[in-house]
């Protein structure tokens, strides 16, 4: 059948199972938006306040579901406003397809109104990108974009569509989506060798990251820990993969991880890294990281093997397939002395002391968990509040904690929470933690939450400073607080009212308990401002370049 480019655009989106699209209209994409208007019963379009918010929403949608997030923006500034969101998804291996409009093909490279070479700009931060110069290529290019985003190590793909392509006509043939290409092969001899090393270990430790978030990978990982009684430490991106309360879960590892997990890394004799890339927030000193251990690394991306830390055995493959193949070779073995040592270290873990005279982050987060129960989805911005949330939330779901890890994007949270809420439905409880610094970055997305009546509860830790940077200035810069005391006078309650949502101001735990209970009853979005001390710190902390011997506990 004969269709124009805009009709093909919608048909392929539906063909790929897209039910929700985040975006912002403009001149170069008017034809696409006209077709979306005609197909509003097939695809829900979410209009955000800013294209960056749309990109974070597509990201949050993908993280919450595992499906591909989709974002659409116009040419020029619309396209460049997506860059931070695309880079955020790229660093955390999130499947996303970003569609951008552009000037007509004959005008490409001539510096026309709102032209930007978005293909070149995004080349380092996408798995692949395309510029579609003929309408005949549009359908298959879109299909390729979705396939690439989900294949192997997941990530964002960009498709740039000149305006004339959206109006041109060609023959269109519908196709069924191709199966996602999964890496099912691996070196069986290496897996046997890995099993032998693990079976011979006296102090084994699993260190796992965001690469095991998929349901297929989570279960074999849990089975391995249980069968061989192996303690496990996780990265920020893997919170919830092994539930809170599992006896083998010894906590988050890295710069703001717990003492036990960091001590275990230093003292283990075999380290099994699964879906983790040894980032500089975990392997702060690559030369001393797990220096006493034989290191086995399992990763779907061959380029990550041995990239940051030298490893003894590198296995390329999908964690689910590798672990399932390894499990029958693993002996049912106990490590009583090692587990006893772990328990002794756990007695030394940092636990903040509550102070009834002021509101403290761990109390707030604990109360949120108490009132929400285990099924809530938690989203964060970036800063001290992000680390507090990672430390104190009782994580139980593999996709229940959504945060920007690799890029560390302040302003990520509200858009991501909107995406998660749209993906999971209004009956799913979504709570977003932010700080006054991060929240100022993209709080304009409040109008989106209000417009779509999304019951997102936003908890704002307001210490009236840029807390994480200030903490570093306290520790390493002689308390020279350069530009981290902004002296802002934002009244978040009045600002909330201006957006059309309910705001609360809390200075003690009783006020917060009452405010959060009330927010849970409301159908729309709410903000709860929590006043905390500007000198509140994220602890423990290992300075950059340090190791367990440099850990700061007070």
Enumerate the predicted regions with their spans.
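Thiamine diphosphate
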Residues: 99, 108-114, 306-308, 314-316, ...
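Phosphate/pyrophosphate-binding active-site segments
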Residues: 136, 174, 196, 292-384, ...
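Active-site diphosphate/adenylate-binding microenvironment
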Residues: 6-10, 14-19, 27, 32-37, ...
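Active-site nucleophile and cofactor-binding loops and adjacent substrate-binding regions
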Residues: 24-26, 45-56, 71-78, 133-134, ...
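Charged, low-complexity, helix-prone segments enriched in Lys/Glu/Asp/Gln
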Residues: 61, 80, 334-354, 420, ...
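Well-ordered beta-strand positions enriched in small/hydrophobic/aromatic, beta-favoring residues
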Residues: 69-71, 159, 378, 401, ...
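N-terminal alpha/beta PP-like core and its mobile active-site loop of ThDP/TPP-dependent enzymes
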Residues: 1-333, 367, 371-374, 429, ...
């Amino acid at each position: 059948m004969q269709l124009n480019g805009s009709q093909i655009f919608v048909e392929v989106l539906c063909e790929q199972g897209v039910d929700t699209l985040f975006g912002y209209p403009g001149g170069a994409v008017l034809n696409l938006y006209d077709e979306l208007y005609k197909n509003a019963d097939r695809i829900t379009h979410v209009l955000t306040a800013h294209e960056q918010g749309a990109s974070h929403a597509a990201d949050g949608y993908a993280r919450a579901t595992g499906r591909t997030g989709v974002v659409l923006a116009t040419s020029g500034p619309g396209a460049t406003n997506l860059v931070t969101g695309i880079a955020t998804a790229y660093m955390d291996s999130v499947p996303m397809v970003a569609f951008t409009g552009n000037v007509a093909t004959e005008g490409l490279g001539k510096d026309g109104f709102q032209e930007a070479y978005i293909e070149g700009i995004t080349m380092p931060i996408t798995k692949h990108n395309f510029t579609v110069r003929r309408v005949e290529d549009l359908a298959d290019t879109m299909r390729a974009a979705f396939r690439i985003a989900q294949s192997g190590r997941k990530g964002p793909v960009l498709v740039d569509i000149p305006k004339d392509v959206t109006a041109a006509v060609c023959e269109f043939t519908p196709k069924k989506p191709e199966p996602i290409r999964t890496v099912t092969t691996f070196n069986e001899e290496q897996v046997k060798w890995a099993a032998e090393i693990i079976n011979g270990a006296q102090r084994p430790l699993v260190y796992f990251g965001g690469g095991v978030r998929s349901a297929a990978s989570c279960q074999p990982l849990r089975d391995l820990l249980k069968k061989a009684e192996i303690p496990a430490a996780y990265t920020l991106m893997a919170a919830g993969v092994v539930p809170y309360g599992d006896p083998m879960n010894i906590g988050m590892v890295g710069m703001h991880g717990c003492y036990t997990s960091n001590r275990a890394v230093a003292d283990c004799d075999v380290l099994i890294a699964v879906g983790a890339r040894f980032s500089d927030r975990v392997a702060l000193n690559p030369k001393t990281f797990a220096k006493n251990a034989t290191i086995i690394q399992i990763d779907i991306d061959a380029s990550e093997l041995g990239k940051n830390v030298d490893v003894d055995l590198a296995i390329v493959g999908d964690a689910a397939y590798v672990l399932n193949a390894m499990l029958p070779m693993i002996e049912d073995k106990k490590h009583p002395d090692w587990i006893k040592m772990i328990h002794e270290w756990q007695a030394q873990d940092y636990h903040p002391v509550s102070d009834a005279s002021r509101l403290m982050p761990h109390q707030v987060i604990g109360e949120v968990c108490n009132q929400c129960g285990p099924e809530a989805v938690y989203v964060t911005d970036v800063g001290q509040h992000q680390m507090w949330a990672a430390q104190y939330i009782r994580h139980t779901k593999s996709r229940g904690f959504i945060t920007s890890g690799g890029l560390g994007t302040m302003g990520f949270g509200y858009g991501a929470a909107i995406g998660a809420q749209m993906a999971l439905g209004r009956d799913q409880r979504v709570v977003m933690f932010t700080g006054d610094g991060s929240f100022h970055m993209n709080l304009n997305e409040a109008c989106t939450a209000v417009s779509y009546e999304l019951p997102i509860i936003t908890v704002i830790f307001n210490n009236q400073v840029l807390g994480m940077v200030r903490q570093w200035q306290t520790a390493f810069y002689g308390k020279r607080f350069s530009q981290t005391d902004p002296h802002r006078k934002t009244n978040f309650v009045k600002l909330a009212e201006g957006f059309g949502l309910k705001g609360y101001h809390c200075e003690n735990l009783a006020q917060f308990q009452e405010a959060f209970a009330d927010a849970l009853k409301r159908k729309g979005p709410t903000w709860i401002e929590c006043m905390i001390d500007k000198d509140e710190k994220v602890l423990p902390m290992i300075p950059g370049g340090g190791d367990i011997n440099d850990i700061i506990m007070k």
